[in-house]
Every structure is written in structure tokens, then in C-alpha cells.
Amino acid sequence: MTSQTTLRPATAGDIPAMEALIQRSGILLSKGFYSDQQAAAVTRHVFGVDSQLVDDHTYFVIERDGKVLACGGWSKRATLFGGDQHKSGPDPLLDPATQPARIRAFFVDPSAPRQGLGRMLMEHCEREATAAGFQAMELAATMPGVPLYLACGFESVEDFSLTLPGNIAVPLSRMRKRIS
């Protein structure tokens, strides 16, 4: 019997499984890109589910045999990165005619890397953002995500560093792609 992989909108009931996946992915898939200290800091202070995306129905999970193997989404809101623990204040809507949609919080379970799950999420998000009238997409990439985003047609427009508690600097890359 073959396993079926399905992509569906995330629900509030998925949040515990997604948070656990994000923790595993943030630590294990950062090896070779970030120091252990950087991976732990970014996973603790930045990575996580942004429940606004779940409420907006723009965050998705990929499941196989009932197990969540990947999550990620897009947003019509201004926040560029970070889970609920990183947010402060309202998250205004973007203007699709003049501002890029945001690609947000892509994570793959360390048990399922390089199986096309990230690309599947990206293609789905691009279709949805295009249907919503957006002309471009933008994201803040962690170093482990840069190869996927380059392969999906994104270009780096700015490298920057995020300083986290403990004065831990984590390099990121702002990336953009035209979609229509």
C-alpha cells in the first residue's frame, strides 16, 4: 500500500503538532547553517505558528499517514516573519497592487527532508497569492531555507542579521519573487 501525501489548510487543532515539528526542524535542519546557539535562539524566540495565518486560512500542513510532515503558508498581512511569541500589535493588510504577499514559516520534519514538500507548499502558496491579486511574494529566509527559495525562483534583495536575547546574531536574507 502506498502512502498518500495531502496538503490542506491548517486548523487550530493542528497547532500542537506544528509547534513540535517547528521545534524539531528548527534545531535539526539548521545544522551546517547555524551554530547550535544560533539554532536554539532562533527556534525559541522567532520560529513558531502565527495563529493569524491559521485564522486567515493561508497556512497549510502536508500530511502522510496522518502525520504532519511540513507546514507553511502565505500572508496578505504586513508581518514578514515570526510566530505568535514574536508579534506585537495589529497586523495590517497589504495592498496586493503595490506590496508583495508574504511567504511565512515553512518547516519540514527532519524525518522527511528533500522530498519536495517545501516546493509543494510554495507552489500552492504562489497559486493562492496570485489568485488574491498579488504581483510579487517576499520572505525572510533563514540560511537553511535559502536553497529552496532560490530553487523556487526567489532572489535575495537584502542580507541582514537579527539580534536575539543573549546578543546572539542570526543571519537572514530578504528574498523576493515576481509572480504575475
Identify what each model region corresponds to.
Residues 122, 129-142:
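Conserved GNAT acetyl-CoA-binding A-motif
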Residues 119, 131, 143-159, 165-168:
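Conserved active-site alpha-helix within GNAT-family acetyltransferase domains
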